[in-house]
């Protein structure tokens, strides 16, 4: 893939009023012919000026028109071919960036790059042949590192940046506006420009306080000579950056100072990206340092053609800013991009428009015919300029109408898809039930076939005995009655005479045949209700009429003769059924074997007499069908309306052709419904409704065909459209038009939608305008010629400094000395300029080094301060908090690249629930009760406060659980406790415990205190003393 460098041009503006009032001197000179820019240091007038060479250099006398025609024109032309392009202005605040990008409406020569790009894009679009374009515009700004949509409903809403593997970095939720001409683009630009953040500073009264990006997205649909479609996509980013500024010059304070800080940070990140791209040793490009660099990521070193316009101020008091701008612009020349044509984008909206236009034209062609459609489209003249201007007055209304139309189409499509899915699921369920019923019928047929074989075997034995007797009698009487042979017919002749009668019944055309299951059922189960409940199917009620007629054509009880006849008919009928619908036994029986079986096993005389008395069943069926058709005709003539419901595609339509055929065969051969309803009209209506609901088509049935014919005569057919199911790459079934019956569409709505879609795309309106095409080619040639002139001028400047001048022949030695003196002076000036450049670079590097070291020292001091504060604060953190372990918090933390901050765990306090320790304060509710009973209000209030304190103490688990209970009892302020356990002698504890003065409710609640150590040693003494006192009391006389 070929790479190209970033194109860089410089433009120097005239001095403004402020600079003229300060009597500033110009320090910038420009050589436009060679694309060189010179800047003189005002503090060192003896030093040579610094020289920079770019792709173009423009001074105060040049207009924006010349800049665009020479430099920007090839880049925008590439966008109309499928490339990505970016044009951005770079420079300090008040250097003319917005003037270069936006410009002035009057005079026309000072119009900016953005409006000229509009004209260029639509000029190329109108001149293109066999190509359609979809042009959409968006406008955003980056204010204080927040992305805002300047064309959205809420211009202050923050938008997020996302990254896509194919689209790259994009803004989620950014509004896109379809534009059709230059006027709409200018109106969109003006709307966004009014919403942009601007402010007043000392250097510029209308200073841009945000970076803005106007994007034009172009989708190109071209058809080559072979008729093959090609889809491409191009994108043009027109960037107007906010300028870097110094607070000392702009006087920014408060909100303006905050804005300036954010602007300088983003521009500094942009400069770091440029430096990293130029430096080949840098492996990491800091695109994520700013949202501006992320949005320009593809423009700097990616798949984009990029043009940088460096705007300069000629004043000497802006020398440092101008020199910095020139250095960054000179570095940007070395950035290599790899642009390529974006072919066949997957998310192209133009592809969807083209497919929908084709579909709508197909629908209209089916309704009106191709000739009428072309005539109608030709009569629809495009709106004139006045009408288009009227429509352009409300682009928001047009967008809302478009969104409403999209929503309507989406809802219609989802409803149709849901209906198709429901029908498909119903058909699948019906098919499952059909297979189950087929299996049940096969099992029943096998049982009946085995019974028939057993009966035929017994009959064969009886017939063999009869034949043996007849042969014996024939041998005896052959000689005597040879002349009277015709009077007695042998059985062989009788069999030959009877066989055509048997075989003539089943040998009918396949359209009126009776299946193998129908014949046995008709003879063995004459009751229609029983067989209906056993063999009927929901999706095949249309065969009810035929089965009813069959049950009436073969009446009679279940006899052996009927069983034998049904067996013969079933074996003969097997020639018209496929083998896959037969079981293991019936598949083995071929038509020849069936005939051989009939010939070898002739029925007895009794079955033959019954067969002779039977009528032709198929003739009776035909008669009943004729009566049915006449009844249906009479019902139609008597205005009995049969509702006609549009058919939905069945499961057979969603399968392969072979599957469709087998489904129809199964429906014809195996779906039997026996019924005996007398009301024919009701039966016909039910069949039509059930057929429309389930979508099962029984085309081979004679009565269904007749009912369909009657329905066609009664009501007109709806529009035939095309519906099929195709599967997209994501695995979703999408409905596409095929030949099925759908509801009629509104012709006016389809035509309006078609015209709306065709108006969305533009291209080729002026393809036959020779003047416009010639102008377009002339501007393209001018840009190429200007590029060649610049290359030639640079070569001439290199030749002037070459060694070929030494070949000149001098007339005298003095002339040679003067020539070499001039050459020496020139080389000395170059050497001095190089030394000054080296000195400036070293001083700049030294200043950056000092700045970096100062920043590192400041960060180290801040880090030490935070570390000391942390060491002092960490012991104060509770142990049950997760932040008491900072190493664990450090391991759990992670850096968020997108948002630029650390993700740290939330502070959590772990509470451990321990059992509550019973203390002496548990008897306070009793005292509260006594206080309440006594009716003292102040005591009641005091008890309430004591209860609150006791609860707070009990909740403090860490202080109460391991606290000594002895100390709390000793230090207890309860006078009752101190009186009972500490002030009394040990011998009186029992008497005090039994004291009647205490309330009885407090006695069991008072806890037993732990004894003192001295009391435990005095236990024997106390016992003896108690015994002695008892004796003394007992011995003393009362």
UniProtKB/Swiss-Prot annotation:
Q: Where is this region: Disordered?
A: 379-401, 503-559, 636-657, 916-940, 976-1038
Question: Which parts of the chain are coiled coil?
Answer: 346-470, 748-855
- Free-text tissue specificity from the UniProt record: Highly expressed in the gray matter of the brain, especially in the hippocampus.
Which Pfam families does the entry link to?
Kinesin
Residues annotated as binding ATP: 91-98
Annotated signal peptide: none
Q: Name one GO cellular component term.
A: microtubule cytoskeleton
Q: Where along the chain is composition biased (Low complexity)?
A: 983-1000
According to its UniProt entry, the protein's GO biological process terms are:
anterograde dendritic transport of neurotransmitter receptor complex; intraciliary transport; microtubule-based process; protein transport; protein-containing complex localization; vesicle-mediated transport
* Protein keywords: ATP-binding, Cell projection, Coiled coil, Cytoplasm, Cytoskeleton, Microtubule, Motor protein, Nucleotide-binding, Protein transport, Transport
The keyword Nucleotide-binding is assigned to this record? yes
- Protein location: Cytoplasm, Cytoskeleton; Cell projection, Cilium; Cell projection, Dendrite
User: Boundaries of each Kinesin motor domain copy?
Assistant: 5-335
| InterPro entries linked | Kinesin-like_fam, Kinesin_motor_CS, Kinesin_motor_dom, Kinesin_motor_dom_sf, P-loop_NTPase
Main site of residence?
cytoplasm
Mark out the compositionally biased spans (Polar residues): 533-551, 636-651
Gene3D superfamilies, sorted:
Kinesin motor domain
UniProt GO molecular function: ATP binding; microtubule binding; microtubule motor activity
What this protein is reported to do is described as: Dendrite-specific motor protein which, in association with the Apba1-containing complex (LIN-10-LIN-2-LIN-7 complex), transports vesicles containing N-methyl-D-aspartate (NMDA) receptor subunit NR2B along microtubules.
Q: PANTHER family under this entry?
A: CHROMOSOME-ASSOCIATED KINESIN KIF4A-RELATED (PTHR47969), KINESIN-LIKE PROTEIN (PTHR47969:SF21)
Similarity comment text for this entry: Belongs to the TRAFAC class myosin-kinesin ATPase superfamily. Kinesin family.
Query: What interactions and quaternary structure are annotated?
Result: Homodimer. Interacts with APBA1 (via PDZ domain); the interaction is direct and is required for association of KIF17 with the cargo that is to be transported. Interacts with IFT B complex components IFT52 and IFT57. Interacts with IFT70B. Interacts with PIWIL1. Interacts with TBATA.
Q: What is this protein called?
A: Kinesin-like protein KIF17
Q: Report the source organism.
A: Mus musculus (Mouse)
Q: Which gene encodes it?
A: Kif17
């Amino acid at each position: 893939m070929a790479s190209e460098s970033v194109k860089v041009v410089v433009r120097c503006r005239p001095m403004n009023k402020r600079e003229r009032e300060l009597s500033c001197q110009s320090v910038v000179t420009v050589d436009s012919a060679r694309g060189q820019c010179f800047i003189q240091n005002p503090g060192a007038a003896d030093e040579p000026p610094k020289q920079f060479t770019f792709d173009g250099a423009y001074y105060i006398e040049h207009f924006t028109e010349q800049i665009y025609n020479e430099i920007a024109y090839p880049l925008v032309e590439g966008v109309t071919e499928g490339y990505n392009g970016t044009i951005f202005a770079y420079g300090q605040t008040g250097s003319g960036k917005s003037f270069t990008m936006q410009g002035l409406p009057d005079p026309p020569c000072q119009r900016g790059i953005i409006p000229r790009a509009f004209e260029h894009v639509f000029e190329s679009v109108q001149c293109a042949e066999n190509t359609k374009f979809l042009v959409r515009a968006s406008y955003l700004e980056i204010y204080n590192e927040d992305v805002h949509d300047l064309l959205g409903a809420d211009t202050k809403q923050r938008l997020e940046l996302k990254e896509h593997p194919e689209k790259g970095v994009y803004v989620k939720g950014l509004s896109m506006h379809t534009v059709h001409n230059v006027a709409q683009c200018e109106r969109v630009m003006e709307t966004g420009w009014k919403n942009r953040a601007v402010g007043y500073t000392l250097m510029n009264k209308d200073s841009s306080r945000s970076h803005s990006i106007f994007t034009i997205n172009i989708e190109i649909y071209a058809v080559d000579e072979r008729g093959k479609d090609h889809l491409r996509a191009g994108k043009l980013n027109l960037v107007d950056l906010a300028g870097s500024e110094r607070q000392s010059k702009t006087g920014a304070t408060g909100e303006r100072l905050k804005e300036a800080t954010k602007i300088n940070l983003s521009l500094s990140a942009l400069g770091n990206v440029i430096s990293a791209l130029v430096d080949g040793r840098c492996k990491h490009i800091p695109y994520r340092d700013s949202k501006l660099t992320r949005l320009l990521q593809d423009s700097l070193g990616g798949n984009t053609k990029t043009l940088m316009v460096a705007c300069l101020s000629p004043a000497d008091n802006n020398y440092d800013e101008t020199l910095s701008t020139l250095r960054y612009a000179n570095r940007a020349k070395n950035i290599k991009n790899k642009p390529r044509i974006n072919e066949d984008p997957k998310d192209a909206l133009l592809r969807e428009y083209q497919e929908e236009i084709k579909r709508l034209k197909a629908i209209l062609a089916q309704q009106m015919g191709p000739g009428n459609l072309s005539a109608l489209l030709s009569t629809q003249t495009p709106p004139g300029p006045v009408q288009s201007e009227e429509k352009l007055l409300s682009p928001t209304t047009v967008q809302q109408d478009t969104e409403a139309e999209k929503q309507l189409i989406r809802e219609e499509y989802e409803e149709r898809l849901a209906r198709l899915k429901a029908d498909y699921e119903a058909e699948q369920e019906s098919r499952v039930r059909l297979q189950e019923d087929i299996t049940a019928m096969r099992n029943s047929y096998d049982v009946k076939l085995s019974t028939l074989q057993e009966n035929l075997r017994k009959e064969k034995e009886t017939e063999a005995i009869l034949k043996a007797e007849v042969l014996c009698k024939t041998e005896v009487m052959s000689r005597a009655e040879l002349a009277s042979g015709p009077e007695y017919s042998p059985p062989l002749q009788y069999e030959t005479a009877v066989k055509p009668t048997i075989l003539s019944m089943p040998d009918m055309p396949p359209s009126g045949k009776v299946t193998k299951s129908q014949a046995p059922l008709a003879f063995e189960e004459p009751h229609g209700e029983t067989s209906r409940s056993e063999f009927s199917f929901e999706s095949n009620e249309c065969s009810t009429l035929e089965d009813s007629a069959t049950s009436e054509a073969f009446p009679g009880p279940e006899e052996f003769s009927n069983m034998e006849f049904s067996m013969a008919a079933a074996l003969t009928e097997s020639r018209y059924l496929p083998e896959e619908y037969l079981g293991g036994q019936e598949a083995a029986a071929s038509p020849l074997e069936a005939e051989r079986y009939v010939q070898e096993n002739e029925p007895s005389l009794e079955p033959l007499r019954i067969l002779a008395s039977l009528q032709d069943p198929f003739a009776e069926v035909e008669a009943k069908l004729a009566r049915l058709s006449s009844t249906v005709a009479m019902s139609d003539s008597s205005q009995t309306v049969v509702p006609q419901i549009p058919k939905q595609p069945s499961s057979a339509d969603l399968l392969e052709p072979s599957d469709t055929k087998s489904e129809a065969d199964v429906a014809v051969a195996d779906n039997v419904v026996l019924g005996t309803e007398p009301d024919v009209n009701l039966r016909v209506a039910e069949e039509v409704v059930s057929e429309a609901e389930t979508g099962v088509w029984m085309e081979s049935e004679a009565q269904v065909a007749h009912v369909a014919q009657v329905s066609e005569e009664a009501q007109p057919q709806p529009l035939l459209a095309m519906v099929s199911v195709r599967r997209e790459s994501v695995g979703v079934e999408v409905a596409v038009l095929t030949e099925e019956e759908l509801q009629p569409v509104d012709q006016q709505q389809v035509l309006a939608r078609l015209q709306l879609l065709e108006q969305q795309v533009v291209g080729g309106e002026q393809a036959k305008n020779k003047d416009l095409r010639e102008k377009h080619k002339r501007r393209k040639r001018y840009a190429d010629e200007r590029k060649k002139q610049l290359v030639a001028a640079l070569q001439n400047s290199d030749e002037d400094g070459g060694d070929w001048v030494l070949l000149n022949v001098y007339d005298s030695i003095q002339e040679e000395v003067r020539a070499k003196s001039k050459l020496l002076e020139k080389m000395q000036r170059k050497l001095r300029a190089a030394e000054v450049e080296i000195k400036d670079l070293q001083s700049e590097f030294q200043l950056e080094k000092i700045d970096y070291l100062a920043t590192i020292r400041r960060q180290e001091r801040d880090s030490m301060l935070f570390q000391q504060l942390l060491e002092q604060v960490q012991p104060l953190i509770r142990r049950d908090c997760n932040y008491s372990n900072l190493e664990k918090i450090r391991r759990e933390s992670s850096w968020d690249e997108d948002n630029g901050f650390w993700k740290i765990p939330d502070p959590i306090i772990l509470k451990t629930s321990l059992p509550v320790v019973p203390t002496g304060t548990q008897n306070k509710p009793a005292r509260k009760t006594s206080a309440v009973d006594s009716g003292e209000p102040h005591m009641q209030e005091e008890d309430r406060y004591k209860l609150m304190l006791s609860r707070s103490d009990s909740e403090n688990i860490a202080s109460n659980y391991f606290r000594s209970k002895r100390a709390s009892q000793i230090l207890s302020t309860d006078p009752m406790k101190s009186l009972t356990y500490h002030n009394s002698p040990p011998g009186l504890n029992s008497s005090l415990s039994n004291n009647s003065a205490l309330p009885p409710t407090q006695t069991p609640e008072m806890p037993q205190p732990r004894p003192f150590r001295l009391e435990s040693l005095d236990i024997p003494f106390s016992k003896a003393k108690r015994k002695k006192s008892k004796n003394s009391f007992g011995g003393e006389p009362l």
